[in-house]
Amino acid sequence: MDSSRKYKRCGFGAALFVANIFFSLLSLHCISGAHGHQQRMKESVMGSEPPVCATKCRNCKPCLPYLFDIRGAHDDDDDSEPYYPVKWICRCRDRVFEP
């Protein structure tokens, strides 16, 4: 009779152990999924911040980021268009450099 109690306690402990491992793995999966979501969000806004231009203009100073509007490159120059292409460049005096 004592041995059956021992096995029941052992079975209960094993079940708790398995449940603990299951929930630990589940929480790790959720955390890594959240990190992946943050990474995708970061990638989706890439390019919206000005570049660091300090070393991009060779020896020319001051080298500053400039948002270049390339609307004129397209045939329809309609100002009512909600989207028009822009590009960040580094500019120093009258020279332009790629960031």
Curated annotation (Swiss-Prot):
Where does it sit, as one GO cellular component term?
extracellular region
Tell me if Disulfide bond is a UniProt keyword of this record.
yes
Does the UniProt entry include the keyword Secreted?
A: yes
A Pfam match: EPF
Q: Which residues form the signal peptide?
A: 1-35
Q: Which UniProt keywords apply?
A: Developmental protein, Disulfide bond, Secreted, Signal
| One biological process term in Gene Ontology | stomatal complex development
Summary of the function given for this chain in its UniProt record: Controls stomatal patterning.
Name the family the entry cites.
Answer: Belongs to the plant cysteine rich small secretory peptide family. Epidermal patterning factor subfamily.
* Stated name of the protein: EPIDERMAL PATTERNING FACTOR-like protein 8
- Provide the species name: Arabidopsis thaliana
